[in-house]
Design a protein with these regions (language model features):
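Hydrophobic anchor at the beta1->P-loop junction of P-loop NTPases
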Residues: 11-13
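Walker A/P-loop
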Residues: 22
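Small-molecule kinase domains that catalyze NTP-dependent phosphoryl transfer to phosphate-bearing small molecules
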Residues: 150-164
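ATP-dependent NMP and nucleoside kinases share a basic, alpha-helical "lid"
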Residues: 102-150
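The conserved Walker
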Residues: 16-17
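Conserved nucleotide-sensing/catalytic segment adjacent to the nucleotide-binding pocket
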Residues: 38-41, 47-98, 110
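Pre-Walker A adenine-sensing motif
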Residues: 1-4
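Post-Walker A helix-loop "phosphate-sensing" segment adjacent to the P-loop in P-loop NTPases
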Residues: 30-39
Length: 164
């Protein structure tokens, strides 16, 4: 990856998250050098829960549409942004309370795309993919810690959605 050519790396996980993807991705950026790496976090491409309430799984109408399902992700926009960077166009990332918008420069040779959404994209978009997994108990513990502190979520909501 340090050959000066353009490379795109996918870092994703299975389950509801908190598997260590973001932590690993940030450390990898530091290791490879910020001056040559873009980190595109895919979490802002997850459709907000209030809009997902409008969807229902036909076979199981009583169940919620969680982020574990592709329909909960704005995949076309994420794919467009990845292709733009790969094609030499800068992008401005989606603004979220926990992740302010920033400009990513297409001049950087390495693009790391990190998040659950990546699992639902065509594998040919990436030169290398790394998949993380964590058990349910560890996932809940990490989500309670991170989502309360960073995403301003209530512990009760996290526990309820973890059971969904």
């Amino acid at each position: 990856m340090l050959d000066g050519k353009k490379h795109t790396l996918a870092i994703y996980g299975h389950g509801d998250g908190a598997s260590g993807k973001s932590t690993f991705a940030k450390r990898l950026v530091e290791s490879l050098g910020r001056e040559r790496v873009n980190l595109l976090a895919a979490d802002p491409y997850i459709i907000d829960g209030e809009y997902r309430d409008l969807l229902a799984v036909r076979e199981f109408p009583e169940q919620k549409v969680t982020a574990c399902l592709p329909v909960a992700h704005e995949l076309k926009s994420l794919k467009r942004d990845i292709r733009a960077l790969q094609s030499g166009c800068d992008i401005v990332t989606i603004d979220q309370p926990w992740a302010p918008s920033q400009r990513l420069s297409a001049e950087k040779s390495i693009l790391i795309v990190e998040g659950m959404s990546v699992a639902f994209l065509p594998k040919e978009l990436f030169d290398l993919s790394i998949c993380f997994y964590t058990d349910a108990a560890t996932e809940l513990e990490r989500r309670l810690s991170r989502d309360v502190a960073v995403r301003n979520r209530q512990p009760e909501w996290i526990e309820r959605t973890h059971q969904a």
